[in-house]
From Swiss-Prot:
Protein name, UniProt field: Protein SEY1
Organism: Debaryomyces hansenii (strain ATCC 36239 / CBS 767 / BCRC 21394 / JCM 1990 / NBRC 0083 / IGC 2968) (Yeast)
Residues in compartment: Lumenal: 763-765
Enzyme class: hydrolase
Gene of this entry: SEY1
Segments of skewed composition (Acidic residues): 835-847
GO annotation, cellular component aspect: cortical endoplasmic reticulum; endoplasmic reticulum membrane
């Protein structure tokens, strides 16, 4: 143990430094020619060197580096190559071990400035920031034996003053407790927490990076697996610390970050060792590298001269702390062995758990309807947990009793946590099953519900499901060790939400069906009334509309202002549903009016009404006007008759002159948001903001009774007048054509010029009769529009006659000479005509 702290002057370290350089000259060869000598920061007698600041100022090119620096320390077992690692990586000149001897080389704590960091960037690059590295005396050395006081304090000092603590271990040490210095780290973490943890409350973003450099990595075990093992060990170790109450909320991740890097074997794989060193150098100097190590919250945020004072103060506090003694070795052994046994039996438990229980757990791909005996399943849970705890008790109960009980409780908690994963799977499966069963039953409505009403049936179904679910889930809860009340409440809440949604669906269905019935009936009434508009048309339509609404509302009214749909919904919801029905009834009324009354429909109605009066008389026979005076009177009368229905079709006004006013302002945006959606109004819907109409404040409010605007009416009248004026002009033109006569002098001209021809026809009865027939036929065909078809038939007859004439001429020219020649041959005794004559006759055949 230390006998006390003593700071040395620079002259006190001269002999030590000379001895170090002398001792290292025979065993150390610089990695690079530009490597820099180191200075002993704390000697083996725990004395702090006050000349550190002078060394820093001399070793840097800038006189004032301020915060532009980084501190890196290395920590690890003795003779594991810590100094060699620093020399190769940072081009420092730390003393290294003679490979022919296994003995302590580094004594105390040494510091050196890194002039160059080895990397793949042009075979090494100078960092933009100054890097100082501290080489800490190795742990577990035979020179100090069981005196571990200095190595613990040195490790604690390095952890408290550095941004990055390099933990140098061999691959074969991963997973070991002492070999990986886990025991020492645990003590250092605990003391560091007690000494410096309170500053974390004021500066909660500061962390230290623990960089594990795994040496002699041959690649059989992936880095990911090694990292997982070390991370798990560190987190577990932190959770077991004696943390002060005021810091109990802080976790390992609040103090430390972890990084990992592997190096090949220096002797057997020299090239890979060098390459791995350079890759690590990239992470230190290349800020664009994905594994860049330095972060802002690692720095202590004090100038370098302040850091030297801070480091000296830390060492004073660490060296003079009387409470730094570690627990007894018996406690350490008990903790280590109990942890080892705990991990062993827990691994066996997990193996059996995965093989026998987890494999049989329900999954998405499995049949969710498979029957499960939850009583038997819960018994198997208990048997497996008890067997695991008995195995731990058998092997670990011989160690320290308090440690054993603590670890047994931890094991029981881990087992329960593992079972909770499976428990959640079965709970989710149960929830899915009962939810599906509930949904299937509810979807059929009253058909499958046991009750007189929907509300009574749904209540009975909920109670049945809650009781069965609670019984099954309690059987697999490890006698209540696994909390399940929240799951029961969750299912209850879920079913209540489903019931609420189904109530809304049923309520909306009632409203929708009622509105559909109203639309069908009211639509027919509107069509019938508009076929023959009268002054009381809108009185009849409004009366029918109100009768439809009142008959629907009265079906569900149970009292003055109270309604019941038999769904178990609240009074507020029922009133909201009735209000919604009434509101949407007026909306449907408005839509039906505009559906059957449009600009085109009104125009057609006016034209039809005008035609009925203008073209037909009281008996329905077509009118034949004899003179213009009669036409003018009929036109004015028909026009007035048609215009009488225009006010009825353009505004919904009762016979007493009042306009139809709806019970709800269907154009109010707030009411549209409240009643116009798909869902039924609930109590929450009353909280809709009244600011929703702010956008329409400047717009003119539309009128329910106004069917067509004044501009629409003007357009209809313009088209109507244009069309009836055209009909008037057409009718008047026909009257003028009928009264128009041929001038008499025309007949005189015809008589004088055609007298001879006329008399020739008159004197010849044949010509006279033929002329009469032809004239009568032409007259008939003209009136029947048959002149063109007749001309086509005549043309075809002429064409056929020409073809027939050609054929007869051909027969005459070819057949008659051949017949005469044949007869002459018989007379002369020749049976066949001469060849030349036959050929000549053949030549007459047309080609």
């Amino acid at each position: 143990m230390s006998t006390g702290h003593k700071s040395l002057s620079p002259s006190d370290f001269v002999n030590d430094e000379n001895q170090s350089v002398g001792s290292s000259s025979s065993s150390f060869v610089p990695v690079e020619q530009n490597s820099e000598n180191a200075i002993q920061m704390i000697n083996e007698n725990k004395q702090f060197n006050e000349s550190i600041l002078n060394y820093i100022e001399k070793s840097t090119s800038s006189s004032d580096i301020g915060n532009n620096y980084h501190i890196i320390s290395v920590f690890g077992s003795q003779s594991t190559g810590k100094s060699t690692l620093l020399n190769h990586l940072f081009n420092t000149n730390f003393d290294v071990m003679d490979e022919s001897k296994r003995q302590q080389t580094t004594k105390g704590i040494w510091m050196a400035h890194s002039p160059l960091v080895s990397s793949t960037l042009t075979n090494g690059s100078k960092s933009e920031e100054n890097i100082f590295v501290m080489d800490v005396e190795g742990t577990d050395g035979r020179e100090r034996g069981e005196d571990q006081d200095f190595e613990r304090k040195a490790a604690l000092f390095a952890l408290s003053t550095s941004e990055i603590l390099i933990i140098n271990i061999w691959e074969t040490q991963v997973g070991l407790y002492q070999g990986a210095n886990m025991g020492l780290l645990k003590t250092v973490f605990e003391v560091n927490l007690s000494l410096f943890g309170k500053s974390k409350l004021d500066k909660n973003d500061h962390k230290v990076l623990l960089l594990f450099v795994i040496r002699d990595h041959i690649g059989v075990t992936p880095l990911e697996n090694l990292a997982a093992t070390l991370t798990q060990d560190l987190v577990a170790m932190w959770d077991s610390l004696n943390i002060p109450p005021e810091l109990s909320h802080l976790q390992f991740q609040d103090f430390f970050d972890i990084a990992f890097h592997t190096l090949g074997h220096k002797v057997l794989q020299p090239e890979k060792f060098t390459d791995d060193i350079k890759l690590l150098g990239n992470k230190i100097i290349d800020m664009h590298d994905s594994g860049y190590l330095f972060k802002k919250n690692y720095h202590h945020n004090i100038p370098v001269d302040g850091w030297t004072m801070y480091a000296e103060s830390c060492w004073n506090q660490i060296d003079n702390n009387k409470d730094l003694d570690l627990p007894t070795q018996q406690i350490l052994v008990a903790k280590f062995k109990c942890d080892e046994i705990l991990n062993l039996v827990y691994d066996e438990f997990v193996l059996g758990f995965n093989e026998h229980l987890l494999a049989d757990a329900p999954s998405k791909s499995s049949d969710t309807e498979t029957s499960i005996d939850y009583s038997e399943l819960g018994l198997s849970f208990m048997q497996m947990r008890n067997a695991t705890l008995e195995n731990f008790e058998l092997a670990a109960s011989k160690y320290n009793q308090s440690v054993y009980e603590q670890k047994r409780a931890a094991l029981s908690l881990k087992i329960n946590n593992k079972f909770s994963e499976l428990f959640e799977i079965y709970v989710k499966d149960l929830v899915d099953k009962y939810t599906k069963s509930f949904t299937d039953t509810v979807s059929f409505g009253k058909k499958k519900l046991q009750g007189n009403t929907f509300h009574e049936g749904i209540t009975n179904l909920q109670e049945s499901i809650f009781q069965e679910f609670s019984q099954n889930i309690a059987l697999i809860s490890l006698n209540g060790d696994l909390e399940y009340d929240n799951h029961v409440k969750g299912l209850q809440l879920k079913l209540e939400q489903m019931v609420s949604k189904q109530q809304i669906v049923e309520l909306n269905s009632i409203i929708t069906k009622s509105l559909k019935k109203l639309n069908n009936g009211l639509g027919k009434v509107i069509v019938e009334e508009l076929n023959d508009p009268k002054s009381d048309t809108w009185d009849n339509i409004l009366e029918k509309f109100k009768s439809y609404v009142d008959s629907t509302v009265s079906k569900y009214e149970v009292g003055a202002g109270e309604y019941d749909f038999g769904l178990g919904t609240s009074l507020q919801s029922n009133i909201g549903a009735i209000n919604k029905f009434k509101y949407k009834s007026w909306v449907s009324f408005h839509e039906l009016i505009h559906k059957y009354i449009s600009k085109d429909n009104v125009l057609n109605s006016l034209k039809d009404r005008f035609d009925d009066k203008f073209r037909y008389d009281e008996n329905g026979l077509p009118r034949l006007y004899q003179n213009g005076h009669e036409l003018d009177n009929s036109f004015n009368e028909s026009k007035s008759y048609a215009m009488d229905i225009l006010p009825v079709l353009t505004i919904a006004k009762l016979s007493d002159g009042t306009e139809i006013l709806p019970d709800y302002d269907i154009f109010d945006k707030r009411l549209r948001n409240q009643y116009g959606g798909a869902s039924v109004v609930t109590a929450d819907d009353q909280q809709i903001s009244i600011d929703t109409d702010s956008e329409d404040e400047e717009e003119e409010n539309p009128c329910f009774a106004e069917i067509l605007s004044e501009s629409d009416k003007a357009a209809i009248l313009a088209k109507f007048k244009k069309e009836i004026n055209a009909k008037f002009v057409e009718t008047k033109r026909s009257i003028i054509q009928n009264v128009t006569q041929i001038p008499y002098y025309i007949y005189l001209v015809i008589l004088v010029l055609g007298w001879n021809e006329f008399m020739a026809i008159i004197r010849n009865p044949l010509f006279f009769t033929l002329a009469l027939l032809l004239g009568a036929g032409a007259y008939v065909m003209y009136h029947l529009n048959l002149l063109k078809p007749a001309s086509i038939v005549a043309q075809r007859m002429i064409d056929e006659s020409i073809v027939l004439a050609k054929q007869k001429l051909k027969e005459f020219l070819l057949d008659e000479p051949e017949t005469h020649g044949h007869n002459l041959n018989k007379i002369s005794g020749n049976k066949t005509p001469p060849e030349d004559e036959s050929i000549e006759l053949d030549n007459l055949d047309p080609k």
